[in-house]
Amino acid sequence: MLPACPRPGSAPTCTRMTPVQLLRELIRRPSVNPAFLPPGHPRAGEAHVADYLAALGRAAGLRVSRLRVAPGRANLLLTLPPTGTARQRVLLAPHLDTVDAAPEQFQPHLRAGRLYGRGACDTKGSLAAMFCALAAVARATPRPARTEIVLAALVDEEDAQRGSRALVAAGWRADLAIVGEPTGLRAVTAHKGSVWLRLETCGRAAHGARPELGRNAVQAMARVVTLLEGDYAAALRARPHPLLGPATVNVGFIAGGRQPNIVPDHCEIRVDRRTLPGETPAGVLREIRALLRLHRLRARLTPLKAEPCPPLETDPHHPLVRQFLDVLGQRAPAGADYF
């Protein structure tokens, strides 16, 4: 339970609020990632939700600070310091932003025991639960003596993950980070990374009546796609991770040629390669280039993202992980194989 703010734009009162009530208030406050809306759109940005939680945090006795990420966008940091000298830090890390939705989806509604609305799962539900838990610990007697608990409500998860990257760049470290992504209420200790790639084939244009005078870049790319979706995907399936299964490759975009009566001189595909713990973007590039050479295929390969998402894995034998498993009655950690 925590101080409530019953209407958007109002100030916290001394009433009490359950996690479900808090989630309703968070859903009512749109926080759509600005990347998905025109500049100045009223639903764009995380500030309204962050300001609301900051006011609640102060009322709950938490230390409130912000870490600027971009103009008008900042991570909200709510800290509960220990009563003694801090020996470890636990980081709670949900995100504030959502993708866009129809206006009615920002009005929460309860159906068959479930609360629906934009961000209810991803991740305003965990944000509400984590906030309420932290507020309860702040009121508890005794409070943690050696553990600092920080709720880092992050911006920009849905686009470029600038919020989490800014947290790391600012030197933040934790002994355990609990990410607010939905997991089906399972303790998850591993998830895949993502590397986006561009492959281009070049040919020579010619008239469609004399294709033998040209070199068809689309045909060349067709062989590359067949290789990636065939032999390469099979090789990835042969080396699965125990929690995540195999790495994957998906050709999600293709473009080439100008019109049917011209032999195309250029073709491009864009590929999503999901990586496993231990794999790196540079290693993926080397692997695909070697595969192309082996099959005598020519294609220009470049990364699409300057900062790919790395795979993550936490030691399943870490004492804090074991405590989580015990509380949940879960025999072993799971992996987010759906990402």
Where are these regions (language model features)?
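Acidic/histidine-rich catalytic neighborhood of metal-dependent amide-processing enzymes
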Residues: 123-124, 128-196
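An extended, acidic, His-containing surface patch that forms the Zn2+-binding/catalytic region
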Residues: 55, 62, 238-241, 250, ...
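Short pre-catalytic strand/loop immediately N-terminal to key active-site residues, enriched for Gly-Thr
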Residues: 111-123, 329-333
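Acidic/His- and Gly-rich active-site-bordering loop/insert found
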Residues: 16-118, 139-145
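Acidic-enriched catalytic cores of C-N bond-cleaving enzymes acting on peptides and small amides
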Residues: 208-254, 262-263, 277-301
